[in-house]
Curated annotation (Swiss-Prot):
Species for this entry: Paenibacillus polymyxa
Active site: E424, H507 (proton donor)
Enzyme type, top EC level: hydrolase
General function of this protein: Involved in the generation of beta- and alpha-amylases from the large amylase precursor.
Hydrolase in keyword set: yes
Protein name: Bacillolysin
Propeptide positions: 25-286
This protein's record includes keyword Transmembrane: no
Domain of life of the native organism: Bacteria
Reaction catalysed by this enzyme: Similar, but not identical, to that of thermolysin
Length: 590
């Protein structure tokens, strides 16, 4: 059937997005101008070298051929930012590149070391020494971090003024390329509104500017930013200094985000020229998505007694699972849900709470991961957001769910489907690991990984969102992983959507990766390629490792293919049936 994409403003959520607002350049390739390369290795460190020193020894050996670095030590330019190990004994390292002490946007690397101390693979993007000479703007910005924040909020304010509130559902038919059928997209943002900042207008007079080496961050009072079209930041605004590769140039920029909920939810990342204050690139990154639940099913869950009532608070998992209600307003987290007798009658709250616990348990038992960040992060959810709000989203710190369209004809409460809850919380996992840019192919990978995990949590079928979409139509859903074309998604790379809507097709092109995952798990013959399925258990272990340990923020589909195959080799052996199936599954989808 023809799919309707609902969205209330320029943010990419569970169901889709509005075209991104003002942007100095619009490219499906996204903000990161660097494309990672993948190398398989079997380099063995000397026996006297162990731990992090294996990584440094490998990079020093490869610094000219792999990194394009000759005259300086790799330790001067690269920093290890994270290290993990998996159940097969492989250690995974994440690194970032710095030039003149300033991080380079998108210049990230992952290196993988086997249990015997051998480097098995490398994935990364770097700025070589010739390119570093293009950093002609130096290290000192001509505008302050507070001015960059102001520029971002002023642009967002202008864009939000043209948008409806959450009481409205807006849509506009848009013809898409024949490879992606017709969709109905919500379109409201004005793509020509790039606003400059007059320094005399800057009202962040109470902002405190903090400097840490070459990184300048601004902690602006929310009341000051709120003067701009009454926008109230959900987190303290900050701007970080980066070098940004653009063509042959290496620009000095600030990277900042606008994160607001009123008058409508918006989370946009801005890359702002640190010399003239112009917006180099921007894109939206809101990630969409005993008592009775929404479907009337009874379930048990953990609450906390407080005086004469009970709170929807679980203190047994990580740092807790807490569920609030926004009472159909647009403020979060809202009010903590309570009940007098511990027999709960808020189905949306029950499901959000129970399914958050289910997702926590899934990650803990399947992958040994302690919550979204791996360190027990509290899982906070808000239900009853807005009025007739047809979406769900992860805003970087918590989950928020709308109640659907009100009469239940198209959508019921979004917390009523465990694969939707798992999908959205997995956006949080991605943010703490690969941090895939929510644009173009990297954004489609971001969406696909959330679909993979959300679907595996429920394991009912190969559909996404079928429990909350068109409840009166049996078998209807938002997406199908086994047959993406049922819901206007491509299932082969030859049909890749190359337009700019939906952040470059993040919800569209995810169908290609979903199909590859389905073939890996279930098997089948597709486009003349036969894949012997390895089962869901092995398939999800491979994808989890590939997406959390191997990929970097600007990874594309070819990187995902290499990462999935390498993860299969590391987990099950280089000549294993799993590794063969992983390669075949991507052959099948192009």
């Amino acid at each position: 059937m023809k799919k309707v994409w609902f969205s209330l403003l320029g943010g990419a959520m569970l169901l889709g997005s509005v075209a991104s607002g003002a942007s100095a350049e619009s490219s499906v390739s996204g903000p990161a101008q660097l494309t990672p390369t993948f190398h398989t290795e079997q380099w063995k460190a000397p026996s006297s070298v162990s731990g992090d020193d294996i990584v440094w020894s490998y990079l020093n050996r490869q610094k000219k051929s792999l990194l394009g670095v000759d005259s300086s030590s790799v330790r001067e330019q690269f920093r290890i930012v994270d290290r993990t190990s998996d159940k097969s004994g492989v250690s995974h390292y994440r690194l970032k590149q710095y030039v003149n002490g300033i991080p380079v946007y998108g210049a990230e690397q992952t290196i993988h070391v086997g249990k015997s101390g051998e480097v098995t693979s490398y994935l990364g993007a770097v700025i070589n020494e010739d390119q570093q000479e293009e950093a002609t703007q130096g290290t000192t910005p001509k505008i302050s971090a507070s001015e960059a924040v102001y520029t971002a909020y002023k642009e967002a304010a202008a864009r939000i003024e043209a948008l409806p509130t959450s009481d409205d559902t807006i849509s506009k038919d848009a013809e898409e390329p024949s490879s992606v059928s017709k969709d109905t997209y919500a379109e409201a943002a004005n793509n020509d509104k790039t606003l400059s900042v007059d320094k005399d207008e800057l009202s962040l007079d109470k902002a405190s500017v903090l400097k840490d080496s070459k990184i300048e961050a601004v902690e602006a009072e929310k009341s000051s930013i709120a003067k701009i079209a009454n926008l109230q930041p959900e987190v303290d605004p900050k701007a970080e200094l980066y070098y940004y590769p653009k063509g042959d140039d290496l620009l000095l920029v600030y990277v900042t985000e606008v994160n607001v909920l009123e008058p409508a939810p918006l989370r946009t990342r801005y890359i702002i020229d640190a010399n003239d204050g112009s917006i180099v690139f921007q894109y939206d990154i809101i990630n969409e998505a005993t008592g009775k639940g929404v479907l009337g099913d009874s379930k048990s869950f953990t609450t906390t007694a407080s005086g004469s009532s009970y709170q929807l608070k679980d203190t047994t998992r990580g740092n807790g699972i807490v569920t609030y209600t926004a009472s159909n307003r647009q403020s979060i987290p809202g009010t903590l849900l309570t009940d007098a007798d511990n027999v709960w009658n808020d189905p949306a709250g029950v499901d959000a709470h129970a399914y958050a616990a289910k997702t926590y348990d899934y990650y803990k038992s399947k992958f040994g991961r302690n919550s979204i960040d791996g360190r027990g992060l509290q899982l906070r959810s808000t239900v009853h957001y807005g009025s007739r709000y047809n979406n769900a989203f992860w805003n970087g710190s918590q989950m928020t769910y709308g109640d659907g369209d009100g009469d239940g004809s198209t959508f019921i409460a979004f917390s009523g489907d465990p694969d939707v809850v798992g999908h959205e919380l997995t956006h949080g996992v991605t943010e703490y690991t690969s941090n895939l840019e929510y644009y173009g192919e990297s954004g489609a990978l971001n969406e696909a990984f959330s679909d993979v995990i959300g679907n595996d949590i429920q394991r009912k079928n190969w559909l996404v969102g079928d429990d909350i979409y068109t409840p009166n139509i049996c078998g209807d859903a938002l997406r199908s992983m086994s047959n993406p074309t049922l819901y206007d998604q491509p299932h082969h790379y030859s049909n890749l959507y190359k337009g700019s809507s939906d952040n470059g097709g993040v919800h569209t092109n995810s169908g290609i990766i979903n199909k590859a995952y389905y073939l890996l798990a279930q098997g089948g013959t597709f486009h003349g390629v036969t894949v012997n399925g390895i089962g869901r258990d092995a398939a999800v272990q491979i994808y989890y490792s590939a997406f959390t340990n191997y990929l970097t923020s600007s990874s594309d589909f070819s990187n995902a293919r290499a990462a999935v195959i390498q993860a299969a080799k590391d987990l099950y052996g280089a000549n294993s049936a799993e590794a063969t199936a992983a390669a075949k599954s991507f052959d099948a989808v192009g």
